[in-house]
Amino acid sequence: MSERIEKIMTVGITGASGGMYGVRLTQELLRQEYKVHLVLTEAAWQVFKEELLLDTTDRQKVIHELFGDLPGELHTHDLHDYAAPIASGSYRSAGMVIIPCSMGTLSGMAHGASGNLLERTADVMLKEKRKLVIVPRETPLHDIHLENMLKLSKMGATILPAMPGYYHLPKTIDDLINFLVGKALDSLGVEHTLFTRWGE
C-alpha cells in the first residue's frame, strides 16, 4: 500500500539560535498526522540544552518528551546515516524545511557538499525539484551569507528568514514563534491556524 506523499515531510534542525522554531513546527506536523523525518545536528542538541534548558544526556528521552504524545509518525535519523530513505531521490515526500538553519549548513547546501544527511537530503530536494524551505537565523549577514541565500533561491529553495511580523499583535514569545512557524508551513503548503492572518 503506497503512502500519501503529501503527508510526508523532512525537518532539519541545526545549531542556529531558535531551536524552538524547529520543535514547534515538528509538533504541528505531527498533530496533523504527518509522517516526519527529523534530522538534528550536534549543535542543535547544544541549543536544546542552552535555550530550551533540556537535559540532553538521554536524547531518546528528549525526543519522547517533545513529540511522544502526538499522533503523527516520527522517524529520527542520525546525522551521518546516508542509508536513510530521505538520502535518495527515489524516496518521495512533499518537501523539507530546515528551521532554524545555521550559516554553515546554508553554505554546505549552496555548494552541494552533501557533507551529512541534512545537506544530502536538501540536495535531493533541489535536484528533484521538491519544496525546500530554509529558515536562516543569523544577524548581521555578510556577503557570503547573502550570496549563498541567493544561490539557493535561484535553485528553487524558499528563503524564509527568522523575522517575525507584528501586525498580528503578538503578546507572548509563543505568538512570535507561532507566526514564523506558520509562515514556514505556508511555504510548505500545510494548512494551520497558528496566527491570525491579515484581514481576518
Swiss-Prot record:
**What residues bind dimethylallyl phosphate, as annotated?**
Y167, K183
| Claim: DNA-binding is one of the keywords in the record | no
InterPro entries (UniProt xref): Flavin_trans-like, Flavoprotein, UbiX-like
From the broadest rank down, the organism's phylogenetic lineage runs: Bacteria, Bacillati, Bacillota, Bacilli, Bacillales
Which residues bind FMN per the record? G15, A16, S17, T41, S102, M103, G104, T105, R137
Mind listing the UniProt keywords for this protein, alphabetically? Answer: Flavoprotein, FMN, Prenyltransferase, Transferase
Q: Please report the organism this UniProt entry assigns to the protein.
A: Alkalihalophilus pseudofirmus (strain ATCC BAA-2126 / JCM 17055 / OF4) (Bacillus pseudofirmus)
List the EC numbers from the record.
Answer: 2.5.1.129
**Matching HAMAP family, A to Z?**
ubiX_pad
Its gene name is ubiX
UniProt record similarity statement: Belongs to the UbiX/PAD1 family.
Q: What does the record give as the reaction this protein catalyses?
A: dimethylallyl phosphate + FMNH2 = prenylated FMNH2 + phosphate
Class of this enzyme: transferase
- Please identify the protein, giving its name as recorded: Flavin prenyltransferase UbiX
* Task performed by this protein: Flavin prenyltransferase that catalyzes the synthesis of the prenylated FMN cofactor (prenyl-FMN) for 4-hydroxy-3-polyprenylbenzoic acid decarboxylase UbiD. The prenyltransferase is metal-independent and links a dimethylallyl moiety from dimethylallyl monophosphate (DMAP) to the flavin N5 and C6 atoms of FMN.
Pfam (any one): Flavoprotein
Q: Which GO terms describe its molecular function?
A: carboxy-lyase activity; flavin prenyltransferase activity
